[in-house]
Amino acid sequence: MQGLFRDPALERHFTGHSGGITQLRFGPDGAQIATSSTDSTVILWNLNQAARCIRFASHSAPVNGVAWSPKGNLVASAGHDRTVKIWEPKLRGVSGEFVAHSKAVRSVDFDSTGHLMLTASDDKSAKIWRVARRQFVSSFAQQNNWVRSAKFSPNGKLVATASDDKSVRIYDVDSGECVRTFTEERAAPRQLAWHPWGNMLAVALGCNRIKIFDVSGSQLLQLYVVHSAPVNDVAFHPSGHFLLSGSDDRTIRILDLLEGRPIYTLTGHTDAVNAVAFSRDGDKFATGGSDRQLLVWQSNLHTYDASQFEAKSALASSSCESSGVSSKQSEGSSTSKSNDLSIRIDPRQSLAYQLSEENFQVLDSKHSTQPEKVLGHGMDFKQHSSSPRFF
């Protein structure tokens, strides 16, 4: 590893939404990113510079969440209009709609097979749906307030929910029973992420903290206070060794979970960072914020070496002290160091940030027919047979 250690670096900079980005997800092949926005649209961004991007604008209210099916043939979006739209990227149109909840839908997720879909809502429930058969399967409704996020575990046997009642609950998919409850005292959880092994859960909290729990043992494993404002999103690196976070303080942090410490502080957003995600191979990560920007980064975490980082961060800290700048202090878990020796990276002067996207073009894809709502049903799914219109 000697000599190969490289810091994360900005690769691409996209703007195109007219409202803040609320969530983002890489496609399974890593060539596309789906973003949802308060401007009521979803955009599929192509990382191939010569390829066009597609904007879907079928929601009638802000879009709160987005997810890819495991095969990449479907994209689901969760709207404040109480619906979940199912998009087929190859057809560039809406293939169906779930009228899934009685209030705003906050998040959407697919299980590892792609057969089941999970939704979370302000109606205090999370629901599982069978995608192909368009059937409601089950509901988890023990929350006493909005459910901001719901995620399948990697093996699909458990569901985790984050609610404004200041709880994180773990449900057994087969039985529907709540098997674990983690209660917060300071603030409600805003987002959560399963560890790739399925045995741990990271929780982003409104009290500026990040917690990592052992799901089976109900134990708090690590606590990080590395942000100065509420934490909006967290994502595990596929290796499980690193955690990415985004906050209202406009920064992105990368944590080394093996050493229990923050290692990078990334700036570049000019407003709250609402969404973070790694690509499936971990080579890239993306961040999106209220400033409407989508930043795509080379993670370079495969080159990370703890000993080289220690030397580099110590040198940076020494330089700061010699220039009269004190190192920032941060609370951490029982395994983390008190001094935040993370390396700060600001990409706003980089070529990748300043370059205009000469080949960038967004195609608007709208469908002329509004799906019908069937009263008395928990769900309505209407297929559209005609071709979408392009503007």
From Swiss-Prot:
<keyword id="KW-0677">Repeat</keyword>
<dbReference type="InterPro" id="IPR015943">
    <property type="entry name" value="WD40/YVTN_repeat-like_dom_sf"/>
</dbReference>
<feature type="region of interest" description="Disordered">
    <location>
        <begin position="321"/>
        <end position="341"/>
    </location>
</feature>
<feature type="repeat" description="WD 6">
    <location>
        <begin position="226"/>
        <end position="265"/>
    </location>
</feature>
<feature type="region of interest" description="Disordered">
    <location>
        <begin position="363"/>
        <end position="391"/>
    </location>
</feature>
<feature type="repeat" description="WD 1">
    <location>
        <begin position="16"/>
        <end position="55"/>
    </location>
</feature>
<dbReference type="InterPro" id="IPR036322">
    <property type="entry name" value="WD40_repeat_dom_sf"/>
</dbReference>
<dbReference type="InterPro" id="IPR019775">
    <property type="entry name" value="WD40_repeat_CS"/>
</dbReference>
<feature type="repeat" description="WD 7">
    <location>
        <begin position="268"/>
        <end position="307"/>
    </location>
</feature>
<dbReference type="InterPro" id="IPR001680">
    <property type="entry name" value="WD40_rpt"/>
</dbReference>
<feature type="repeat" description="WD 5">
    <location>
        <begin position="185"/>
        <end position="223"/>
    </location>
</feature>
<dbReference type="InterPro" id="IPR020472">
    <property type="entry name" value="G-protein_beta_WD-40_rep"/>
</dbReference>
<comment type="similarity">
    <text>Belongs to the WD repeat POC1 family.</text>
</comment>
<dbReference type="GO" id="GO:0007098">
    <property type="term" value="P:centrosome cycle"/>
</dbReference>
<dbReference type="InterPro" id="IPR050505">
    <property type="entry name" value="WDR55_POC1"/>
</dbReference>
<protein>
    <recommendedName>
        <fullName>POC1 centriolar protein homolog</fullName>
    </recommendedName>
</protein>
<feature type="repeat" description="WD 3">
    <location>
        <begin position="100"/>
        <end position="139"/>
    </location>
</feature>
<feature type="repeat" description="WD 2">
    <location>
        <begin position="58"/>
        <end position="97"/>
    </location>
</feature>
<comment type="function">
    <text>Plays an important role in centriole formation.</text>
</comment>
<dbReference type="GO" id="GO:0005814">
    <property type="term" value="C:centriole"/>
</dbReference>
<feature type="repeat" description="WD 4">
    <location>
        <begin position="142"/>
        <end position="183"/>
    </location>
</feature>
<dbReference type="Pfam" id="PF00400">
    <property type="entry name" value="WD40"/>
</dbReference>
<feature type="compositionally biased region" description="Low complexity">
    <location>
        <begin position="321"/>
        <end position="338"/>
    </location>
</feature>
<keyword id="KW-0853">WD repeat</keyword>
<dbReference type="GO" id="GO:0036064">
    <property type="term" value="C:ciliary basal body"/>
</dbReference>
<dbReference type="GO" id="GO:0060271">
    <property type="term" value="P:cilium assembly"/>
</dbReference>
